[in-house]
Amino acid sequence: MSQRLKDHYNKTVVPQLMQQFQYKNIHQVPKIVKVTVNRGLGEAAQNAKALEATLAEIATITGQKPVVTRAKKAIAGFKIRKGMPVGVAVTLRSERMYAFLDRLINLALPRIRDFRGVNPKSFDGRGNYTLGLREQLIFPEVNYDDIDQIRGMDVSIITTANTDEEGRALLKAMGMPFREN
């Protein structure tokens, strides 16, 4: 499944972007470097079971074991001390990245209720795209009966694009369904 998106990039997207942006060298064409999936867990400090469930869930969705992110400093208002677990993150590259993106674009995003497309303004100014998902149930790997609580996650797509326009063109050519404003 991952090979499909990579082949689409090499055979269709690269020539299209070379023509659109008048690149002289094939290495100037933007490509996706990595995808990071992150979930902040405020209740992980008090509830160890939530952390275990999240680790298993993110591993199932991405196909890679996530790393536990810990608090850098103590914040009394949030009742956390330095070193307490506050979330999980996973960085996907190469084959797993393409497999995850393929599932995200073709399976998960269309399953969102009232989905009209993703926000085209969520670029960071350097061609990278960040997308917030409200629930984990949109992924077909997640079994509805196994989850204890609906939690969201952040998905960041890091590209070699220099501008938002190049990044948007790359992701649109890869099949990302952007909302028409």
UniProtKB/Swiss-Prot annotation:
One record GO biological process: translation
An example molecular function term from Gene Ontology annotations: rRNA binding
Presence of keyword tRNA-binding: yes
InterPro entries reported in the protein's UniProt record: Ribosomal_uL5, Ribosomal_uL5_bac-type, Ribosomal_uL5_C, Ribosomal_uL5_CS, Ribosomal_uL5_dom_sf, Ribosomal_uL5_N
Domain of life: Bacteria
Keywords of the record: Ribonucleoprotein, Ribosomal protein, RNA-binding, rRNA-binding, tRNA-binding
GO cellular component assignments: ribonucleoprotein complex; ribosome
Assembly description: Part of the 50S ribosomal subunit; part of the 5S rRNA/L5/L18/L25 subcomplex. Contacts the 5S rRNA and the P site tRNA. Forms a bridge to the 30S subunit in the 70S ribosome.
Family: Belongs to the universal ribosomal protein uL5 family.
Purpose of the protein: This is one of the proteins that bind and probably mediate the attachment of the 5S RNA into the large ribosomal subunit, where it forms part of the central protuberance. In the 70S ribosome it contacts protein S13 of the 30S subunit (bridge B1b), connecting the 2 subunits; this bridge is implicated in subunit movement. Contacts the P site tRNA; the 5S rRNA and some of its associated proteins might help stabilize positioning of ribosome-bound tRNAs.
HAMAP family: Ribosomal_uL5_B
Record's protein name: Large ribosomal subunit protein uL5
Natural source organism: Thermosynechococcus vestitus (strain NIES-2133 / IAM M-273 / BP-1)
